[in-house]
């Protein structure tokens, strides 16, 4: 059993949109936190059908409920019209809702009622290291951090089913059936570009579609919680920085499956990419769970200097190296960034055995970095 970091009970008195990709553990968390509340699960066909036919049923069933009671609606994006009824019940009966979903895209596209700011927004991420007793870094790098994938020895069949279900659901939702092959190809190309700067034109050529279509495909991945676009950090004066975003899938296991990566040995390029992805994944979750206003960006100059992770307005710069001994050549990007931001905290996360400091750069073993991250000592 994993003890999740997200604490929805701290939002008592407010309604909440709880978003998160499929199988991140949203439903399990809600069952654990609120075992006895009224719950509507729109994944159940009979529940979906009756509310789809008549959304007003929700108001009729809840109009006289005790306002102190919480109501959960799972997969709210399946019937956007229900949000009008939710809005009325919140405004006129002071009922508190948790509205759970795996995709905000349908709601955005149909201009659904997003409750006018009356509901807080929370995101459920895959598991993080602080939630797992006896966390195994190598296992996480290979399996990913979705609960059903991390716990098994070989998650390949579960990953295959996950990607298949996602494609079927999103292709159907987006009416992309005639473009199934191009979208599937796009997901594979996006995996090859994972952690790299996006060049839409090049990806479009590889997929056989237009650059605008590729931008729309990336938007689908973002709005269905399957990926993140991380912008470039450009607030530097001495060196020209690139603004094009990088893309990361929301979980390293997805990339491993799409690229057929397995049994990655430490010291190899593939292990290094997966190592960086997992750590970026943890930082994204940390920022999200702490509702931080600080943005995550990366820095790359036209001359080739790069830092994988910039926190805030240049306050912290973090690089990831999967080697077992960081040397000065591994810190060139950080030292170049220091010329722009002399007060920046400089960090390299690696497979070093012990924490140390080398010319103003803190070298963290990965496990120690993760421990200090979740102890609020990094960001």
Annotated model-derived regions:
Residues 105-120, 136:
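Short regulatory helix/loop adjacent to the ATP-binding pocket of P-loop NTPases
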Residues 1-10:
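Pre-Walker A adenine-sensing motif
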Residues 157-315:
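Accessory nucleic acid-recognition modules appended to NTPase machines
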Residues 26-27:
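Conserved lysine of the Walker
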Residues 18:
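Hydrophobic anchor at the beta1->P-loop junction of P-loop NTPases
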Residues 353-379:
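Domain-level recognition of nuclease-like catalytic cores that cleave nucleotide substrates
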Residues 40-70:
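Short glycine-rich substrate-engagement loop in P-loop NTPases that contacts/grips substrate
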Residues 72, 96-102:
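Structural recognition of the conserved hydrophobic beta-strand(s) that form the central parallel beta-sheet
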């Amino acid at each position: 059993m994993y003890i999740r970091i997200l604490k929805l009970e701290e939002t008592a008195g407010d309604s909440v949109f709880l978003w998160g990709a499929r199988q991140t553990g949203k439903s399990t968390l809600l069952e654990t936190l609120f075992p006895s509340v009224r719950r509507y699960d729109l994944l159940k066909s009979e529940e979906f059908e009756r509310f789809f036919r008549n959304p007003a049923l929700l108001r009729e069933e809840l109009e006289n409920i005790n306002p102190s009671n919480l109501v959960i609606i799972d997969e709210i994006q399946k019937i956007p019209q229900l949000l009008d009824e939710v809005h009325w019940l919140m405004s006129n009966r002071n009922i508190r809702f948790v509205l759970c979903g795996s995709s905000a895209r349908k709601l955005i596209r149909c201009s659904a009622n997003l409750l006018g700011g009356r509901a807080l927004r929370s995101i459920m991420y895959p598991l993080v290291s602080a939630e797992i007793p006896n966390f195994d870094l190598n296992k996480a790098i290979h399996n990913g951090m979705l609960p059903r994938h991390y716990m098994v020895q070989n998650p390949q069949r579960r990953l295959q089913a996950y990607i298949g279900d996602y494609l079927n659901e999103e292709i159907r939702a987006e009416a992309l059936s005639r473009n199934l092959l191009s979208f599937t190809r796009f997901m594979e190309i996006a995996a090859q570009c994972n952690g790299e700067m996006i060049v839409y034109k090049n990806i479009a050529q590889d997929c056989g579609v237009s650059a605008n279509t590729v931008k729309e495909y990336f938007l689908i991945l973002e709005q269905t919680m399957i990926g993140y676009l991380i912008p470039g950090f450009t607030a530097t004066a001495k060196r020209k920085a690139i603004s094009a975003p990088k893309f990361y899938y929301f979980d390293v296991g997805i990339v491993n499956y799409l690229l057929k990566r397995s049994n990655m040995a430490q010291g190899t390029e593939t292990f290094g990419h997966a190592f960086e992805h997992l750590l970026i994944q943890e930082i994204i979750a940390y920022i999200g769970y702490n509702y931080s206003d600080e943005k995550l960006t990366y820095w790359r100059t036209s001359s080739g200097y790069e830092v994988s992770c910039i926190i805030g307005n240049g306050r912290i710069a973090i690089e990831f190296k999967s080697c077992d001994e960081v040397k000065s050549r591994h810190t060139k990007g950080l030292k170049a960034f220091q010329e722009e931001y002399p007060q920046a905290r400089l960090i390299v996360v690696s497979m070093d055995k012990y924490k140390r400091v080398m010319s103003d750069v803190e070298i963290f073993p990965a496990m120690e970095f993760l421990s200090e991250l979740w102890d609020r000592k990094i960001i």
